Amino acid sequence: MKALARFGKAFGGYKMIDVPQPMCGPEDVVIEIKAAAICGADMKHYNVDSGSDEFNSIRGHEFAGCIAQVGEKVKDWKVGQRVVSDNSGHVCGVCPACEQGDFLCCTEKVNLGLDNNTWGGGFSKYCLVPGEILKIHRHALWEIPDGVDYEDAAVLDPICNAYKSIAQQSKFLPGQDVVVIGTGPLGLFSVQMARIMGAVNIVVVGLQEDVAVRFPVAKELGATAVVNGSTEDVVARCQQICGKDNLGLVIECSGANIALKQAIEMLRPNGEVVRVGMGFKPLDFSINDITAWNKSIIGHMAYDSTSWRNAIRLLASGAIKVKPMITHRIGLSQWREGFDAMVDKTAIKVIMTYDFDE
């Protein structure tokens, strides 16, 4: 079968390669991939050439499919079930994070479809979910409810991230306002979570390149206002829209240093920033404001079983909308077109399906 693989250790590019179909062990589950989505985490390796031919991983950690095989010792899953993976492949099972069910904060975690794994990912025909993870973490897989299709289920990862950031990590109360910085899937699902939870003003901050595609979708999904950070004073505009006493929560999804600076500045005293986006440059500004005005910066990583259980119910109920965000549906053989669309921001979410003849 074909698979889109990454090569090199720290950074490296992608190649479409031939790989054998995974062998199902006695405790394993093999999924036939029905839909896989390109994530922002996949983009950092696109058009990168490390000069290395060392295999790293089959990519694609946002995927859903149908169980094709189960090992003889597997009791909880059956061939034919429609499932979505939370992309856990390995955790230690004994650290404080694992004991709390926060498996993706395990320092020994290995994710399916991400770096340095041998089990596989969504950018192929089949992916193996190892029995070792299913013994520790049964909810490494979730059954897809009736009425939810594969492409919607494939993007439950960012939905669950948005759920956890607002519903579980922040102290948000209905009737307050929320600013979301960033217009990718994490940002747009955060808009929907803020709407569901009863925010009055939901302000989305983006850039000039978001005006054509992403701003209109943000409004369709519940944003009450958009702010163009390329042409407007972000802090002043957000405070003007919300009023200085109502802006208690900023969900920062871009990872840009300037965005974190703006988020801290615009908050009212005792406000919170949940930092969902990840940047790679040292901070170049003072954060004394968080001490002077009792503001909080909350780090965010992934989700837990509560996030998944409730996000799946919201998706099945129709409260969460995915279709407006799926801008491209392509075969895996056209993967470069999908990545290019992500680069130029004509895409929000790209869904790929396996289209190679065996």
UniProtKB/Swiss-Prot annotation:
<dbReference type="InterPro" id="IPR013149">
    <property type="entry name" value="ADH-like_C"/>
</dbReference>
<dbReference type="InterPro" id="IPR050129">
    <property type="entry name" value="Zn_alcohol_dh"/>
</dbReference>
<dbReference type="InterPro" id="IPR002328">
    <property type="entry name" value="ADH_Zn_CS"/>
</dbReference>
<feature type="binding site">
    <location>
        <position position="95"/>
    </location>
    <ligand>
        <name>Zn(2+) 2</name>
    </ligand>
</feature>
<feature type="binding site">
    <location>
        <position position="157"/>
    </location>
    <ligand>
        <name>Zn(2+) 1</name>
    </ligand>
</feature>
<keyword id="KW-0560">Oxidoreductase</keyword>
<feature type="binding site">
    <location>
        <position position="92"/>
    </location>
    <ligand>
        <name>Zn(2+) 2</name>
    </ligand>
</feature>
<protein>
    <recommendedName>
        <fullName>Uncharacterized zinc-type alcohol dehydrogenase-like protein YdjL</fullName>
        <ecNumber>1.-.-.-</ecNumber>
    </recommendedName>
</protein>
<dbReference type="Pfam" id="PF08240">
    <property type="entry name" value="ADH_N"/>
</dbReference>
<dbReference type="InterPro" id="IPR011032">
    <property type="entry name" value="GroES-like_sf"/>
</dbReference>
<feature type="binding site">
    <location>
        <position position="106"/>
    </location>
    <ligand>
        <name>Zn(2+) 2</name>
    </ligand>
</feature>
<dbReference type="GO" id="GO:0008270">
    <property type="term" value="F:zinc ion binding"/>
</dbReference>
<keyword id="KW-0862">Zinc</keyword>
<feature type="binding site">
    <location>
        <position position="61"/>
    </location>
    <ligand>
        <name>Zn(2+) 1</name>
    </ligand>
</feature>
<dbReference type="Pfam" id="PF00107">
    <property type="entry name" value="ADH_zinc_N"/>
</dbReference>
<dbReference type="InterPro" id="IPR036291">
    <property type="entry name" value="NAD(P)-bd_dom_sf"/>
</dbReference>
<feature type="binding site">
    <location>
        <position position="98"/>
    </location>
    <ligand>
        <name>Zn(2+) 2</name>
    </ligand>
</feature>
<dbReference type="GO" id="GO:0016491">
    <property type="term" value="F:oxidoreductase activity"/>
</dbReference>
<dbReference type="InterPro" id="IPR013154">
    <property type="entry name" value="ADH-like_N"/>
</dbReference>
<feature type="binding site">
    <location>
        <position position="39"/>
    </location>
    <ligand>
        <name>Zn(2+) 1</name>
    </ligand>
</feature>
<comment type="similarity">
    <text>Belongs to the zinc-containing alcohol dehydrogenase family.</text>
</comment>
<keyword id="KW-0479">Metal-binding</keyword>
